[in-house]
């Protein structure tokens, strides 16, 4: 069980990020700006790529030289059901420089293609990966292993009754293979909503909440697993091997959180220099009506929890579909300082005018956070996603930003296309 400590938060000035405009994008809901895009932006050592839906719901790809303000943009031959905010686009580069794209998924057949040549924005034909268990796909995510191979995560099945599937791609043979058809099982009664992170050592961390039904109010608990061999075998935070698939009964729990706690699903996690995991989320305590951002992490004494505690506005999570929520699900980045790891938490909150905001600390354990804004104007219902590979290489936080609107459920707002922007910010400056 995690030890609990409230954090203190103060305002702080922040160096302005550098902003570039890519092009106009669909803004009638939050499909371009949901937190679970892995990735919205991705780069190799000299070129960065971006993906989004335009106003006609076409999948658009763009690229630029790192450091440049000029983007080359290409509208692909593919469209997606952008009216459903679940149907986000995910990108990743493999070790050979080929761009992989998955898009338009919410309990429907796999939609996947890759660039015709390394460095190209043109996509080849839509294709299968392994050709099995690809008929009901949601939440596609790519992760690049240190050797250039890729992992592809997705949920098979629906909310409240889905399983976590993992495929692996080999650039040398240009083929996908199945690693796990059912890494985390809901046993037909629930499903795991996960977040994952590949650390600098190549360890793959996964944490998740369970959901008992399609109603978000049934989210509960926070569980954890890790893999030291590229996703093949899995263990607890203490190194105890898991017998697969992992179930509600066999999972290691970082924190027990009851249903009806406004616990959100699909957030983010990171790891420090020693490979210790850090999970960002939000929920409310019993006896409080205000959900607060939290960081749950593992140290030598066990699982710990820090409550940032700076919010004042109440809200409640319940029902189905994409919710219009006054705060964004957070992204967390953790420094590689061995003794006193610091962190950056990126979020949006109506209390702060729905801007791109950050909370920073130089020492997660002491609970002192500084909060500031990276933008002056509102970004509507935006949630943070970023270039994981650029952050890993250089410590530059490159954020996908767009002012979008989300109507509760799967409604659409009557708004014009809004600029897709990239904000580059170095937290140390």
Where are each of the predicted segments found?
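Boundary at the C-terminal end of the N-terminal hydrophobic targeting segment
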Residues: 11-15
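Extracellular, repeat-based ectodomains that mediate carbohydrate processing or recognition
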Residues: 16-429
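Gram-negative bacterial Sec-dependent N-terminal signal peptides
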Residues: 1-10
């Amino acid at each position: 069980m995690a030890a609990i400590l409230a954090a203190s938060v103060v305002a702080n000035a922040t160096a302005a990020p550098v902003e570039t405009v890519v092009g106009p994008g669909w803004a009638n809901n939050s499909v371009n700006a949901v937190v679970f895009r892995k990735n919205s932006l991705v780069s190799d050592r000299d070129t960065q790529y971006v993906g989004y839906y335009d106003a006609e719901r076409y999948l658009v790809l763009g690229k630029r030289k790192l450091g440049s303000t000029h983007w080359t943009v290409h509208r692909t031959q593919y469209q997606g059901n952008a009216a459903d905010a679940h149907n986000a686009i995910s990108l990743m580069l493999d070790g050979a420089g080929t761009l992989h794209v998955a898009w338009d998924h919410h309990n429907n057949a796999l939609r996947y293609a890759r660039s015709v040549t390394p460095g190209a924005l043109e996509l080849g034909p839509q294709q299968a990966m392994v050709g099995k268990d690809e008929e009901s796909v949601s939440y596609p995510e790519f992760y690049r292993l240190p050797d250039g191979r890729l992992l592809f995560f997705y949920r098979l099945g629906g909310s409240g009754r889905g399983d976590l599937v993992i495929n692996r791609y080999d650039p040398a043979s240009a083929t996908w293979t199945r690693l796990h058809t059912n890494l985390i099982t809901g046993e037909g009664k629930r499903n795991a909503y996960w977040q994952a992170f590949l650390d600098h050592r190549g360890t793959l961390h996964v944490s998740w909440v369970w959901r008992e039904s399609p109603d978000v109010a049934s989210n509960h608990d926070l569980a954890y697993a890790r893999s030291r061999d590229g996703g093949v075998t899995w263990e607890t935070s203490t190194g105890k091997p898991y017998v697969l698939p992992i179930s509600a009964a066999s999972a290691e729990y970082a924190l027990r959180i009851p249903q009806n706690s406004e616990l959100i699903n699909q957030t983010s996690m990171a790891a420090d220099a020693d490979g210790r995991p850090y999970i960002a989320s939000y929920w409310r305590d019993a006896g409080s009506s205000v959900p607060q951002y939290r960081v749950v992490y593992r140290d030598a004494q066990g699982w710990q929890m820090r409550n940032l505690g700076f919010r004042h506005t109440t809200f409640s999570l319940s029902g189905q579909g994409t919710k219009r929520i006054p705060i964004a699900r957070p992204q967390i980045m953790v420094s590689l300082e061995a003794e006193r790891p610091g962190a950056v938490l990126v979020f949006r909150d109506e209390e702060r005018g729905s801007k791109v905001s950050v909370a920073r600390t130089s020492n997660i354990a002491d609970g002192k956070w500084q909060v500031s804004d990276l933008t002056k104007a509102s970004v509507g219902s935006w949630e943070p996603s970023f270039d994981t590979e650029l952050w890993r290489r250089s410590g530059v936080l490159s954020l996908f930003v767009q002012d979008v609107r989300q109507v509760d459920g799967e409604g659409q707002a009557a708004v014009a296309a809004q600029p897709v922007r990239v904000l580059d910010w170095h937290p140390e400056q």
